[in-house]
Design a protein with these regions (language model features):
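A conserved acidic beta->alpha catalytic loop
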Residues: 39-48
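Short, acidic, metal-binding catalytic loop of nucleotide-sugar glycosyltransferases
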Residues: 24-33
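Acidic donor-binding/catalytic loop of UDP-sugar-dependent glycosyltransferases
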Residues: 45, 92-107
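Glycine-rich, basic loop-to-helix element that forms the pyrophosphate-binding segment
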Residues: 65-82
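Conserved short acidic donor-positioning loop in nucleotide-sugar-dependent glycosyltransferases
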Residues: 26, 40-41, 66
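N-proximal low-complexity "stem/linker" segments adjacent to membrane-targeting elements
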Residues: 1-25
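Short beta-strand-to-loop element that shapes/binds the nucleotide-sugar donor at the catalytic cleft/hinge
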Residues: 114-132
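Short aromatic/hydrophobic "clamp" motif used to bind/position activated sugar donors
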Residues: 87
Length: 162
């Protein structure tokens, strides 16, 4: 697929199972995007898993610790390290919906910011920037097929268009 590359900047700290799900969801997108994982002193096997991937479009920043940099510092570092002009801040516990990249690129115009709607389980209050839907709270409970089906068939954006 010939589309512009997006750099997905993902800070992570001891969030291996969610990070694996986030990584897989990005790799399932149509485009061959750059993923930049920033490991902030994780002790849960994150760095070993990253090292095992053999992904040429994966950039890694590893803070071996023991002092943490924190999520804001890691996002800043990731933006500095990105090799593409299009950057998406992505949390380790997020899942990329099918065609996320296509929709981001479709709406991106010079001088604009494009965002995606967050879909969260009903753990926190609703807000204008997110939708509350329960596809599972923990990795082992998350129903990716139900989520993908909802995105493909039933999802209507709160703001803007698809």
């Amino acid at each position: 697929i010939n589309m512009k590359k997006i750099t997905f900047v993902i800070p992570s700290r001891n969030n291996l199972e969610f990070l694996q799900l986030a990584y897989k969801s990005i790799r399932n997108l149509k485009g061959n995007h750059e993923i930049l994982v920033l490991n902030d002193a994780s002790t849960d096997g994150t760095q070993e898993w990253i090292n095992s991937l053999g992904d040429n479009d994966l950039i890694v920043y590893h803070n071996p610790g023991p002092e943490r940099i924190g999520i804001v510092g890691m996002f800043d570092k990731g933006i500095e390290m990105a090799r593409t002009d299009i950057i998406m801040a992505f949390h380790a516990d997020m899942v990329a919906a099918p065609n996320l990249d296509k929709h981001i690129l479709k709406h991106l115009k010079r001088g604009t910011v494009v965002s995606a709607t967050r879909v969260e389980p009903p753990l926190h209050p609703d807000g204008p920037e997110k939708m509350l839907m329960n596809f599972g709270i923990e990795v082992e409970d998350f129903d990716i097929n139900k989520f993908n089906n909802w995105v493909s068939n039933d999802y209507q954006p709160k703001h803007g268009t698809l």
